[in-house]
């Protein structure tokens, strides 16, 4: 889950919550505020321009669709990536982003409960709806007088592609999926702790 706030210099800041600290939510609240911990994980993403959406090099499927577009044909509206076409140029201001996903530790520290089906403080929070996320954001902002929000799709995609440091990898940080993602049947049986794979060019994990 990704959140953004405006800084005093009007610079957008995207925050991806996710912490690997091995302590309880109660200990966290006594020693350091949730916001202090979240901000300690932030990585600056320099603003820039990139091609958003599926491109010819993204996949064989997108190659076929791009060819169809060139020929004036319309891709199948039921295809999984049709809403990612055509690729188009997007320019973004700089923002901050955390190196991890939002963990159950952070969620519980804010909400006082953990809805996740697979409990684990350092695992990403799951089993949450969009409305639940909005409630989480509102409570975080009201409690700590912050101005967080969910990022745009473009902000998220730019960061996962490596921003201005992108080396054009097939996956986020590598051409070898096992380096950067959990994908095998055994690994997908339950969520994995954050930060367990190689980071991408910006230092973002998972």
Q: What is each PLM-predicted segment?
A:
Residues 1-9:
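N-terminal secretory signal peptides that target proteins for export/translocation
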Residues 31-33:
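A domain-start/cap signature at the N-terminus of enzymes
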Residues 9-10, 39:
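Residues marking helix boundaries in flexible regions
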């Amino acid at each position: 889950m990704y959140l953004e706030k405006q800084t005093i210099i009007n610079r957008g800041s995207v925050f991806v919550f996710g912490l690997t600290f091995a302590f309880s939510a109660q200990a966290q609240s006594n020693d350091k505020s949730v916001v202090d911990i979240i901000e300690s994980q932030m990585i600056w993403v320099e603003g820039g321009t990139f091609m958003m959406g599926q491109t010819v090099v993204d996949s064989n499927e997108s190659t076929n669709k791009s060819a169809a577009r060139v020929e004036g044909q319309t891709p199948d509206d039921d295809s999984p990536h049709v809403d990612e076409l055509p690729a188009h140029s997007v320019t973004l201001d700089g923002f901050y982003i955390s190196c991890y996903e939002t963990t159950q530790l952070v969620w519980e520290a804010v909400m006082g409960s953990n809805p996740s089906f697979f409990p684990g403080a350092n695992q990403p929070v799951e089993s949450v709806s969009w409305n639940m996320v909005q409630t989480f954001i509102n409570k975080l902002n009201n409690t700590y007088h912050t101005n967080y929000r969910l990022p745009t799709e473009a902000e998220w995609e730019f960061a996962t592609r490596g921003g201005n440091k992108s080396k054009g990898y097939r996956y986020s940080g590598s051409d070898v999926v096992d380096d950067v993602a959990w994908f095998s049947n055994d690994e997908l049986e339950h969520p994995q702790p954050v930060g367990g794979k190689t980071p991408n060019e910006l230092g973002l994990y998972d």
